[in-house]
Amino acid sequence: MLTQHVSEARTRGAIHTARLIHTSDLDQETRDGARRMVIEAFRDPSGDSDFTDDFTDDDWDHALGGMHALISHHGALIAHGAVVQRRLMYRGPDGRGHALRCGYVEAVAVREDRRGDGLGTAVLDALEQVIRGAYQIGALSASDIARPMYIARGWLSWEGPTSVLTPTEGIVRTPEDDRSLFVLPVDLPDGLELDTAREITCDWRSGDPW
């Protein structure tokens, strides 16, 4: 798939453009560089980060198989995000169940020395473009510090219980993920109105379910 220039952020006198590229079209050097940058961005030497477990191999695996938004400067990657397809299961007040085609946002990170320049906004602009063009709903798991940013962009905080559909135990609650989930409805099935106070269930994967 061809890359596509989708959004820009002006930083330090230069214009940086986020480009969209599928995992299958990433060369190994770019893929490895993105992984290293994201790992470093999630690591907090002070130990005060929300991401106490840092960025795991499973976390990186979750970011593969979909579209990546990349911003580079002088050949070095300075911002990254990805959106991958998942299914979210939701049952409305009428009892009807829905398996919603979801664009799930992963591995959004900006290199430490480039934070505060609007690069994260440019990455999210690109990822939201993918969500609006290909999915029924967007979703992501956000840290407390990031909540105001997503709310300002129109994402909805999920207030109801969260759960995961496991291969051996059926639906299992994920209380540790309650109130960290945000959704962005963009093309819901006719007649469906989400009630964010109800339960929502994600598909199974290794590592963190959400």
From Swiss-Prot:
One Pfam match: Acetyltransf_1
Binding-site residues, CoA: V108, A109, V110, R115, G116, D117, G118, L119, G120
UniProt-annotated binding residues for substrate: D54, E106, A107, S141, E176, D177
SUPFAM superfamilies, per the entry: Acyl-CoA N-acyltransferases (Nat) (SSF55729)
Family of this protein: Belongs to the AAC(2')-I acetyltransferase family.
Stated role: Catalyzes the coenzyme A-dependent acetylation of the 2' hydroxyl or amino group of a broad spectrum of aminoglycosides. It confers resistance to aminoglycosides.
Name of the molecule in the record: Aminoglycoside 2'-N-acetyltransferase
Annotated organism of origin: Mycolicibacterium smegmatis (strain ATCC 700084 / mc(2)155) (Mycobacterium smegmatis)
Origin organism lineage: Bacteria, Bacillati, Actinomycetota, Actinomycetes, Mycobacteriales
